[in-house]
Amino acid sequence: MASLRIEVISLFPEMFSAISEYGITSRAVKQGLLQLTCWNPRDYTTDRHHTVDDRPFGGGPGMVMKIKPLEDALVQARQAAGDAAKVIYLSPQGRQLNQSAVRELAQEEAIILIAGRYEGIDERFIDAHVDEEWSIGDYVLSGGELPAMVLIDAVTRLLPGALGHVDSAEEDSFTDGLLDCPHYTRPEVYADQRVPDVLLSGNHAHIRRWRLQQSLGRTYERRADLLESRSLSGEEKKLLAEYIRERDDS
């Protein structure tokens, strides 16, 4: 059975229990689909204070993570993952992660994630060892651990056998370049709000058409930029035009 090996270099490895002990990612670990190991740079320091950071050259606020503890942790991670493992640094300067990139990463056999802290890590480590830099958005976080967990969760969902239903990953938002359609469950009526009749009809062709139309409409209203980079089929153009017309008439 194929599996993905992910090695994480982090000053806070305990945070990754959220991945290994809960939800879909935990199930993937238990099934052997995902192998997750954390390496703490503090374990590779030689001074009694386990120093992993120092003041930046040129002055300025904050601290910068030192090269040597990171390199020594990376050596161990490479021994575990193999020399072919892609090294990724979670960084606000990186390319923004999207579903297309997640699909590519899910094809890898092994990934090493670097979760930085403080003002970042010494640029010489990045130049020497990092293959790719990825960001999860244009906002500031305290470290790379949460972005690393986001990446791990997103990639794990695409591993064969990780989800309970074979179609679940294919029907997620962004998988086909569109936002997801609305979903409903019991009861049929709640606070005078009814489930759309088409979903109760049992007509699978009509249900598919309604869901596609809702996905197109939501994307048009909330993330029109996604439609600009997507070529719509004739059916999709018709459904979107109907959605806009019905919305404007209501």
UniProtKB/Swiss-Prot annotation:
Primary localisation category: cytoplasm
Cellular location(s): Cytoplasm
Alphabetized Pfam families for the sequence: tRNA_m1G_MT
Binding residue positions for S-adenosyl-L-methionine: 116, 136-141
Binding partners and assembly: Homodimer.
Function according to Swiss-Prot or TrEMBL: Specifically methylates guanosine-37 in various tRNAs.
HAMAP family: TrmD
Protein name: tRNA (guanine-N(1)-)-methyltransferase
GN (gene name): trmD
